[in-house]
Amino acid sequence: MRRIAVMGAAGRMGKTLIEAVQQTQGAGLTAAIDRPDSSLVGADAGELAALGRIGVLLSDDLAKVADDFDVLIDFTHPSVTLKNLAFCRKHGKAMIIGTTGFTSEEKQLLAEAGKDIPIVFAANFSVGVNLSLKLLDMAARVLGDDVDIEIIEAHHRHKVDAPSGTALRMGEVVANALGRDLQEVAVYGREGQTGARDRQTIGFATVRAGDVVGDHTVLFAAEGERLEITHKASSRMTFAKGAVRAALWLDGREAGLYDMQDVLELR
């Protein structure tokens, strides 16, 4: 059995991850961790996820459960994830990282850690989203410079980063396929007298409202026709199942920084 720890276990995504781990053959939740000031520390992780008692108590310190897991799943915040990354690197633990909002410099720290431990880092662990990335690469290469490209994403009102990590990853895939640097061609929102659109740019629009789990649309608009590639998530479970799948896939892998394209053999 693959022994899995979940960081941020008392949060919305953490509870979903606990459920996904317990539903997956070959995986078992052996540690659950949340922030030290959480009033839920000491509670049974199964009860937190409405699964009943499973005998795993919520801890407030990763070091206290260091001997209890093989791989850590972390969907928290960059500052938290980087601390956990250093711990896992020191102790030889594998990691699944679904945290978004990293800077370029912070992403380099992930790459450095990948020299010592196996890591799967992805902006989105949904199988459908990762298939969409493959389709986006194909569409961008075929359509080339003859279309205007816009990326529209929507998430719940509690999401703290914008655009979403998934939207940015979609932009990177499209830009790379076209031989462009996303940092140079991205346009984040528009206001006022913007003038005619530059076809070399890639536009981003963000919606934050209600309880939207995650909607992403990439629009390729030409004269006379347009192509839209859309993915809509209706449950966090799709991300959680993908993360657990990645955790099982990492078993026995050499050190390296992988992503879901590797897990799904889409390269």
Curated annotation (Swiss-Prot):
Q: Which Pfam families match?
A: DapB_C, DapB_N
- Catalysed transformations (reactions): (S)-2,3,4,5-tetrahydrodipicolinate + NAD(+) + H2O = (2S,4S)-4-hydroxy-2,3,4,5-tetrahydrodipicolinate + NADH + H(+); (S)-2,3,4,5-tetrahydrodipicolinate + NADP(+) + H2O = (2S,4S)-4-hydroxy-2,3,4,5-tetrahydrodipicolinate + NADPH + H(+)
Cite the Gene3D superfamilies for this sequence: Dihydrodipicolinate Reductase, domain 2, NAD(P)-binding Rossmann-like Domain
Provide the protein name.
4-hydroxy-tetrahydrodipicolinate reductase
Q: Where in the cell is it found?
A: Cytoplasm
Q: In which pathway does it act?
A: Amino-acid biosynthesis; L-lysine biosynthesis via DAP pathway; (S)-tetrahydrodipicolinate from L-aspartate: step 4/4
* Entry GO MF terms: 4-hydroxy-tetrahydrodipicolinate reductase; NAD binding; NADP binding; oxidoreductase activity, acting on CH or CH2 groups, NAD or NADP as acceptor
Q: Which UniProt keywords apply?
A: Amino-acid biosynthesis, Cytoplasm, Diaminopimelate biosynthesis, Lysine biosynthesis, NAD, NADP, Oxidoreductase
Q: Where does NAD(+) bind?
A: G8, A9, A10, G11, R12, M13, D34, G98, T99, T100, A122, A123, N124, F125
The entry's function note states: Catalyzes the conversion of 4-hydroxy-tetrahydrodipicolinate (HTPA) to tetrahydrodipicolinate.
Q: What is its main location?
A: cytoplasm
- Which residue positions are annotated as catalytic? H155, K159
Organism in which the protein naturally occurs: Pseudomonas putida (strain W619)
HAMAP family reported for this sequence: DapB (MF_00102)
Q: Which GO terms describe its biological process?
A: diaminopimelate biosynthetic process; lysine biosynthetic process via diaminopimelate
Q: Which family does it belong to?
A: Belongs to the DapB family.
Which residues does the annotation say bind (S)-2,3,4,5-tetrahydrodipicolinate? H156, G165, T166
* InterPro entries in the cross-refs: DapB_C (IPR022663), DapB_N (IPR000846), DapB_N_CS (IPR022664), DHDPR_bac (IPR023940), NAD(P)-bd_dom_sf (IPR036291)
- According to its record, what are the GO cellular component terms? cytosol
Q: Which NCBIfam families match?
A: dapB
* Amino acids binding NADP(+): R35
Which E.C. number(s) belong to this protein?
1.17.1.8
Q: What is the lineage of its organism?
A: Bacteria, Pseudomonadati, Pseudomonadota, Gammaproteobacteria, Pseudomonadales
